[in-house]
């Protein structure tokens, strides 16, 4: 059976619009973009804006849409990019607080009152307290005035919010900030690759097939990421998903304790399986 998918490049204002919500599932990695990656992103966007370029392409994301949970898109690949964009937009809203379109890109709003209904991006990842940290920094009442340079023990959400905050403060003209916001909303774009399924499991399985061949901002996907997603899907089918997540987290913690990369385990496992099955083609 062929794989049916939808792929259409969209600007940020169209990505985060309507009733669409993005769900980062439990099996995904914790947020990991650091100063270097965030600085590269904001510098590229500012340079593109300064040069008045026609647009700025942010890359691909892979999402699964099931008919039984329509408009709740499970993020298979691109969670780091979507999370970082949301952090950037939250900082920009502090400087451009009356921008309803920007506000609506961070949260779903009531059509009549513009009151916040819920965030457009929600993470179910519980490793490293991702849920709590993310909720804290995108909260409408987050105190930007109290922001201080984070120490080494601060979480990545706070560190990256502070980085974006200091970078935007360098744009001293309010009109220029507003124009920069408009550039991001209407000129920056993503390519969402979306698979459809009658239920969550079938939509996810299709998306995982794409996931195996897509790179995340130029970084090859780890063997462990692919195994984790596939094993999670199997566990979900037999209602063992929470048990799997706990077991995986324990495995990861044990690897950290003995200073072993979890991906090395699955690279070895993949090598063994290929040998047992007589596969001689070069490994990717």
Q: Model-flagged regions — what are they?
A:
Residues 1-284:
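Covalent nucleotidyltransferase
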